[in-house]
Regions:
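Surface-exposed, interaction-prone regions with an acidic/low-complexity signature
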Residues: 1-14
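Catalytic core of the metallo-beta-lactamase
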Residues: 1-3, 48, 56, 96, ...
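Solvent-exposed loop/turn segments at secondary-structure junctions
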Residues: 2-3, 42-44, 69-72, 151
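Short, solvent-exposed loop/turn and secondary-structure capping segments
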Residues: 7-8, 49-51, 75-76, 156
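Cap/insert and terminal regions of metallo-dependent hydrolase folds
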Residues: 11-22, 129-179
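Metallo-beta-lactamase
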Residues: 15-29, 33-45, 60-123, 172-179
Length: 179
């Protein structure tokens, strides 16, 4: 298993980005070898790299994200009701995940659980409705992988109660634990 965690924005934000596949190949791997992708949340800068030209970049991967996250960002009704400035977030998530959903390669996470041996999903809602961290444990060591739990380290490490405009639930974002 070669799990990927953050597919990034792909080329959604311009042609100078989206070099993940090149970097995977430079490391001696192929995108087809990635079999697990763990999504912290579905903002375009975190899921845009899942697709290229509408096709799955990682065709053998199971993409996992929180049930609430998928239910919110992949909902046509929510897109239709979203303010104009938020529609791009919904459209980006839908375009990025649709090929995986259609292929049966999207799996929702509904609880804090071990997804594969040594990797556990942990709810850290606040930045988005279904934000999650992933805790990797092996040989007595622990690594916490997070998305946008922290935005400005110099400010938020000193005062974790500081949130940002993009946190959908400011109160929950203040108390989300890192692990």
């Amino acid at each position: 298993m070669w799990p990927g965690v953050w597919p990034g924005a792909g080329t959604l934000f311009g042609p100078t980005l989206g070099k993940l596949v090149d970097q995977i190949r430079a490391a001696g791997y192929q995108p087809e070898q990635v079999d697990e992708i763990l999504i912290t949340h579905m903002h375009p800068d975190h899921v845009g790299g899942l697709v290229a030209d509408g096709r799955m970049v990682f065709p053998n991967a199971t993409v996992r994200a929180d049930t609430r996250e998928g239910g919110f960002w992949l909902s046509q009704a929510n897109l239709d009701q979203a303010p104009a400035e938020a529609k791009g977030f919904f459209q980006g998530a839908m375009a990025s995940l649709k090929p995986y959903v259609d292929a049966g390669r999207f799996k929702a996470i509904s609880a804090d659980e071990e997804l594969v041996p040594g990797i556990k999903a942990v709810a850290t809602h606040g930045h988005t409705k279904g934000h999650r961290n992933y805790v990797v444990e092996s040989k007595g060591q622990k690594l916490v992988l997070w998305g946008d739990l922290m935005h400005v380290a110099a400010v938020q490490f000193a005062d974790p109660s500081v949130t940002i405009q993009f946190d959908t639930d400011q109160k929950a974002a203040r108390v989300s634990p890192p692990s």
